[in-house]
Amino acid sequence: MLELNGIDKSYGTRKVLDGVTFTVGDGRMTGFVGGNGAGKTTTMRIILGVLSSDAGTVTLQGSPITAADRRRFGYMPEERGLYPKMKVLEQIIYFARLHGWKADAAKKNATELLERLGLGERLNDTVESLSLGNQQRAQIAAALVHRPEVLVLDEPFSGLDPIAVETVQSVLTDYAAGGAPVLFSSHQLDIVERLCDDLVIIAGGQIRASGSRDELREAHGSTRYELLLNGDAGWLREQPGISVIDFDGGYAVFEADSAEARQQVLRAAVAHGDVVSFGRERTTLAEIFKEVVR
């Protein structure tokens, strides 16, 4: 488990991180979301030791992170960091060799990884000849080629088309399934919602919310409930303690002034006919994000 506790960082009089605390669990995909300037990149750079914090600790499996630990990390910065005139395969092999891989093993793993990321036909092309989306895939390969035990990725889905997004999702999911803590930032909240197990929301250098998707929906989700019947739901308007927000035939959205009133709706729905679905109105990550950063 990767854990940050009480991380502070200031530049002069400007405090950019204020008590940042969260965990990235083993085998879990953790989405790190926030607006521009919220503190995501600074936090990631502190995790990697690129920047030092003014206060707080970063630990891995309960112990302070060492230089040896960080060599087992896979880090992808938001900025392009590849050599533009170098061939794609040669470059990824080079990154594997920097991590101590022997030449043959580095070439084999780099080739397999690039093929899986959809760059199998571009191995001998220079980086500068690739589209921005393919450059992003190559940059992801550079972060993964040494088979890291922890992943920290800053905007890995930026510039990717939907097919490439699915490809990268599959690769990252496999890393998490193998037990690696995976932390990634993204402005694409739909991707974060679909992919991650846990969410961390940061604004103004402070963590505004963190937890699993279900935990965040429970804490910050809608207070409305949805009912869908194979029949008319007009009777719902007469239920005590119920305010109907929306209604269309057998579909209704309502709020209840108590848990008992809500349960009474379910009992009445069963008595009136075939219940297709009943539950809390689904709240999107975008809606939760807007609420907690307000």
Residue spans for each PLM region:
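Conserved catalytic Walker-motif region of ABC-type ATPase nucleotide-binding domains
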Residues: 4
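ABC transporter nucleotide-binding domains
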Residues: 9-203, 209
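A generic structural signal for secondary-structure junctions
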Residues: 61, 91, 100, 218-221, ...
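ABC transporter nucleotide-binding domain
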Residues: 169-256
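C-terminal coupling/interaction segments
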Residues: 257-294
